From Swiss-Prot:
GO cellular component: ribonucleoprotein complex; ribosome
SUPFAM superfamilies for this protein: RL5-like
Keyword Oxidoreductase assigned: no
Gene Ontology MF terms: rRNA binding; structural constituent of ribosome; tRNA binding
Family, per entry: Belongs to the universal ribosomal protein uL5 family.
Gene that this polypeptide is encoded by: rplE
Name assigned to this protein: Large ribosomal subunit protein uL5
Function comment: This is one of the proteins that bind and probably mediate the attachment of the 5S RNA into the large ribosomal subunit, where it forms part of the central protuberance. In the 70S ribosome it contacts protein S13 of the 30S subunit (bridge B1b), connecting the 2 subunits; this bridge is implicated in subunit movement. Contacts the P site tRNA; the 5S rRNA and some of its associated proteins might help stabilize positioning of ribosome-bound tRNAs.
UniProt lineage: Bacteria, Pseudomonadati, Pseudomonadota, Gammaproteobacteria, Alteromonadales
Amino acid sequence: MAKLHDKYQETVVAELAKKFGYSSVMQVPRIEKITLNMGVGEAVADKKVMEHALRDMTAIAGQKPIVTVARKSVAGFKIREGYPIGCKVTLRGERMWEFLERLVDIAIPRIRDFRGLSAKAFDGRGNYAMGVREQIIFPEIDYDKIDKIRGMDIVITTTAKNDEEGRALLDAFNFPFKK
């Protein structure tokens, strides 16, 4: 079992229940899922690009990503409906906790010129979205085997009712927010 999951069950639930005055532990916000999304627009011209993106995403997430396709044709981007333009993976359960642990302890400290995560990236319902500019911050990616540096979006979906609860939940997991 992931250390963060144990920490959540043992200490975070009690702390948040006390802080927000919940009558039941089931009211305490929890992390529902983590979604990783990588837009690969260059895949329209070169199919190999999508294979590399899928390989990187599989290594990072530990599960096979789904290929996302264009919903409609856009002449300006030279894409047609149904063209593969990205990949995404949704992590839940044990894999989600393990990924969160690696993100907080290993990946985020490896971001170049890192000054803290923006606290403004909450969506109003306690969910947090962040962007990563390069996939090489994850230890699973071998720098010599990548074809190109790609970024990705990471969305942490919580059961929090508002941003304050979501922020308190992520703070409890030592997320490095800007002061």
